[in-house]
Amino acid sequence: MTTILKHLPVGQRIGIAFSGGLDTSAALLWMRQKGAVPYAYTANLGQPDEDDYDAIPRRAKEYGAENARLIDCRKQLVAEGIAAIQCGAFHNTTGGMTYFNTTPLGRAVTGTMLVAAMKEDGVNIWGDGSTYKGNDIERFYRYGLLTNAELKIYKPWLDTDFIDELGGRQEMSEFMTTSGFDYKMSAEKAYSTDSNMLGATHEAKDLEFLNSSVKIVNPIMGVKFWDENVRIPAEEVTVRFERGHPVALNGQTFSDDVELLLEANRIGGRHGLGMSDQIENRIIEAKSRGIYEAPGMALLHIAYERLVTGIHNEDTIEQYHAHGRQLGRLLYQGRWFDPQALMLRDALQRWVASEITGEVTLELRRGNDYSILNTVSDNLTYKPERLTMEKGESVFSPDDRIGQLTMRNLDITDTREKLFNYVESGLIFSGNAGLPQVANPSLQDKSAK
């Protein structure tokens, strides 16, 4: 039996993820007028561009919501964000700049917490504003059904009746006005923005064209670091972790993770830290482009990875990066709570994050320009005395190194023979492409005789 309802279920309760914007306002009012019983649920994700959350449920009731609830998701959102940092769960990077999966993290929290609230109210039909071309429609679908196995999905934007009547923003605005609501359509921007307290996403419209750069974006979490008229003085900041968890900024200890992240956002935002331009692969394999902000996540990530490289050995770091990228892709696909993701999270948090205790001092300048000034940890395996170039007591002697190099003769000989075989078969040409002049030592011995 299908879980997706193509037409409005008249007379039934429908929970709508209500943002208070034009789209969800018009959808809620339309559903009520057509005979459904809408319930509105708003997630408080600490969006930097939202200044009055309490007003949103009130507006929902004015538009016909049977009930409207504001669900505080900030604590859970920050917990998932810190888990992502601990695991390095980020797979989209361009030129060393990272996308911190802030929208996928927000969807994981929203999709589970709102549906759980609906279930408490006996609401088993859910609608949201995601479109059929994007990632969110699948993320919300997965998280919703994971939370409530009896859930049915109704999306006005998949209903041809709704689209025929209110297919565009102009039609929605006129509908609100003729229904007696003085709803003023916000000014059209050159792009759309979606945000939570972990980060902001700017995409679509003009940003679909690659000749439209970051310079058309007005940051909501940072500053226009590319604008020479914006003064951004350098700033030192110290970040402290205990067992993989960020606990202090500039010597100030935080007992509330939400407040710590807000302060990290303020510090990083003053410099435009964590802003990136990414071309990515959506779940449906089509490529899209986005401009992202995540100043606090970037600050914590930089300090965390500095400690990772100073504490763990090479093989552990390699596994951290490999599994982190794999986990990041699962997160992006809406599989953050799937068994394969939980397995990776557990391993990375248990064996990598648990050892990350220490303090990193950075100097932040403009954008992603920064320097690491100091790294302090009792767990560091970086010990300069082991490799010092100065005369003194050493953990190994010249004779020890001679023995170690002699043991390399075995694999050097094997490699030389393999290279000769490749030359003989025509796979490579001796002396080309930076390869050494390769000769078969056995043939050389015969010619010498």
From Swiss-Prot:
Catalytic reactions on record: L-citrulline + L-aspartate + ATP = 2-(N(omega)-L-arginino)succinate + AMP + diphosphate + H(+)
Known pathway: Amino-acid biosynthesis; L-arginine biosynthesis; L-arginine from L-ornithine and carbamoyl phosphate: step 2/3
Complex formation: Homotetramer.
Gene from which this protein is expressed: argG
Gene3D superfamilies: 1.10.287.400, Argininosuccinate synthetase, chain A, domain 2, HUPs
GO BP term, pick one: L-arginine biosynthetic process
Pfam families in UniProt: Arginosuc_syn_C, Arginosuc_synth
Protein name (record): Argininosuccinate synthase
GO MF term (any one): protein homodimerization activity
Enzyme type, top EC level: ligase
One Gene Ontology term, aspect cellular component: cytoplasm
